[in-house]
């Protein structure tokens, strides 16, 4: 039996956070900025099957050119619970190791001041095709057969891309740094669509029986019902990490961190549960810097990345303030005030949740015995929240009360419909009105005149937000 989680109800919540980046004194060498794994050029260098130990050098280096070396230290509030990439759709840990057929085009973001700045990559769910480029696929097309009611997607698999070779990893030695093949892609896409624990299997029932075949030496073809074509293009290209079949065959899955194997810019070197995750540079990474003074350089620039697991908010802030952490997201407005006073060398960026989900609360709609199955309960929970009050008290009047599915950002400007928009449905506008009396009435009609008890699983950064909401619901 499949388990499905639905994002709803308290998904139109306003969120604003800060990205704080540590800035070292001028006399101190700084850690080079990493080049994210988002290539644009189709060039695929031929790489050996054993790691090259020397870092690539350019004959002439201008003062502005990026330098090789250094380790970027980050912090997050939760530990990793799922290492198998098929069970994930996104995430920092996976994106450093594994890759998909499409990913974001780095040159269309800021790119250190050399990109087109069509996006700032703030949207975790950024799914605009115009902002994508080929990673493990370097060619693609899709066609429509209305007579058969069928859509066809064809991917050309990029030549010259090899699996990272970490001599200290048994799983990596098993793959032996071989070239990625069309068979690898077919295996991975089928696994994502048919394995009961895979993310795509759980959320996209319509893909469980699609036809995925190798149709050429480096060609993969997918046939789907025509109604599902657009979603299939997005999900199969940019929501399934490609994995080596032999690792899954030998170990059953890849949920042991020691079996992590990918084509990304880094390799998983070490993991200490509840403490840290350590990544080492993949010396055979296939891609090049696409833009700026480092254009053409082999990526990545960093020697490694270290992620500290720091559940306690005060500990994370202290690590950032003292320079033990180079960058951190999810800083609250209240904490940002103190950081500005006590750590003035920090750089900051304020951003609003750009996919409109804010701080989402997941509820089970496939369980009829739970209150959330009734739409009146879900509407009551929304109407019992004073969104404007939270905006003013918790966020200092800054930020948006976002309306699902997208907030007002330039990437999704055409899709945004605000509360004051004449096209915004009145029934939806009512959800943001803060009407606790109407909420009580709806609960009574749904059979819960005295309310009901439930529990939520939260991260430490969400506690303040939902503590306010909990008090509102209690009334």
Describe each model-derived feature in a short phrase.
Residues 105-110, 114-127, 194-196, 233-306, ...:
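Gly/Pro-rich hinge or "lid" segments in bacterial periplasmic/extracellular proteins
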Residues 130-131, 138-197, 221, 307, ...:
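Aromatic- and charge-enriched surface segment that lines or borders ligand/interaction sites
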Residues 73-146, 190, 261:
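N-terminal lobe/hinge region of extracytoplasmic solute-binding protein
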Residues 266, 398-442, 462-465:
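Structural transition elements
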Residues 198-199, 213-214, 269-280, 306-369, ...:
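Extracellular/periplasmic solute-recognition and catalytic clefts
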Residues 154-156, 178-179, 183-186, 191-248, ...:
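Surface-exposed binding/hinge segments that line
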Residues 21-22:
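C-terminal motif of bacterial Sec signal peptides marking the signal peptidase cleavage site
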């Amino acid at each position: 039996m499949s388990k499905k989680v639905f994002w709803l109800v308290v998904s139109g919540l306003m969120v604003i956070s800060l990205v704080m980046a540590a800035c070292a004194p001028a006399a101190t060498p700084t850690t080079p900025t990493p080049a994210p794994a988002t290539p644009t050029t189709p060039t695929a260098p031929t790489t050996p099957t054993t790691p090259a130990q020397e870092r690539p050098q350019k004959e002439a280096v201008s003062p502005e050119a990026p330098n090789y070396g250094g380790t970027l230290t980050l912090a997050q509030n939760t530990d990793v619970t799922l290492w198998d990439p098929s069970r994930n759709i996104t995430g920092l840990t996976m994106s450093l190791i594994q890759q998909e057929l499409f990913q974001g085009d780095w040159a269309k973001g800021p790119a250190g001041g050399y990109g087109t700045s069509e996006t700032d990559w703030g949207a975790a769910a950024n799914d605009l095709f115009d902002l994508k480029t080929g990673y493990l696929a370097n060619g693609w097309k899709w066609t429509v057969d209305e007579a058969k009611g069928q859509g066809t997607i064809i991917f050309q698999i990029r030549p010259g891309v090899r699996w990272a070779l970490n001599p200290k990893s048994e799983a990596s030695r098993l793959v032996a740094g071989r070239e990625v093949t069309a068979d690898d892609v077919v295996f991975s896409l089928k696994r994502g669509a048919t394995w009961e624990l895979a993310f795509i299997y759980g959320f996209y029932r319509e893909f469980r029986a699609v036809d995925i075949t190798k149709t050429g030496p480096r060609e993969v073809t997918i046939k789907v019902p025509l109604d599902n074509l657009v979603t299939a293009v997005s999900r199969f290209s940019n929501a399934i990490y490609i994995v080596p079949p032999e690792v899954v065959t030998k170990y059953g899955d890849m949920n042991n961190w020691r079996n992590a194997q990918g084509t990304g810019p880094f390799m998983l070197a070490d993991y200490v549960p509840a403490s840290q995750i350590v990544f080492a540079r993949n010396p055979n990474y296939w891609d090049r810097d696409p833009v700026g003074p480092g254009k053409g350089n082999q990526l990545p620039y960093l020697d490694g990345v270290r992620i500290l697991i720091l559940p306690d908010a005060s500990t994370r802030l202290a690590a950032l303030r003292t320079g033990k952490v180079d960058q951190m997201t999810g800083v609250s407005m209240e904490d940002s005030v103190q950081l500005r006073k006590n750590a003035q060398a920090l750089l900051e960026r304020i951003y609003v949740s750009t996919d409109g989900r804010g701080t989402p609360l997941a509820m089970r709609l496939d369980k009829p015995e739970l209150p959330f199955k009734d739409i009146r309960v879900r509407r009551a929970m929304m109407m019992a929240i004073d969104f404007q009050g939270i905006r003013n008290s918790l966020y200092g009047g800054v930020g948006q009360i976002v309306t699902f599915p997208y907030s007002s950002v330039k990437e999704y400007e055409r899709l945004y419909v605000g509360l004051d928009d004449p096209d915004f449905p009145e029934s939806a506008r009512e959800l943001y009105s803060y009407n606790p009396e109407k909420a009580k009435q709806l609960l009574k009609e749904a059979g819960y005149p005295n309310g009901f008890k439930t529990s939520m699983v939260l991260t430490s950064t969400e506690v303040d937000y939902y503590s306010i909401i909990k008090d509102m619901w209690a009334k």
